[in-house]
Amino acid sequence: MDKVEDGIGVFVNFTNHPSQMWENVQIRAALHYGESILDLLFPQVDPMADEIDLQNLAEEKTSEILSLHPTAVLCQGEFGLCFSVVRRLQKAGVRVLYACSERKVRVEGSTKTVQFDFVKFRRYE
């Protein structure tokens, strides 16, 4: 795990998974990177959007995130937008992370249940 100076600042959760739904282990891991967690909803991306639309949205969302002065950002969502935002945040010197989880599958008859258990955050490199 990255060493963060006293966890001061804000950890931005830029996903469509509100932190209120996280398990305690994930909350504690996020608070290692910041003294508070701020949820910023990852937008729905129109599959018919072209590259220019996507770049404009990435620029808008990156500016919004940077205005929060994050110590770290969890960025997960639609691949194209995610990639563009991650690159921009990295260029601005922001630590950008994604969640690593263990996938557990339980099959009972014709029903398959999948559970994802958070393990850690990993830095985009």
Write out the residue ranges for each language-model feature.
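Long, low-complexity, Lys/Arg-enriched
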Residues: 1-70, 84-87, 91-125
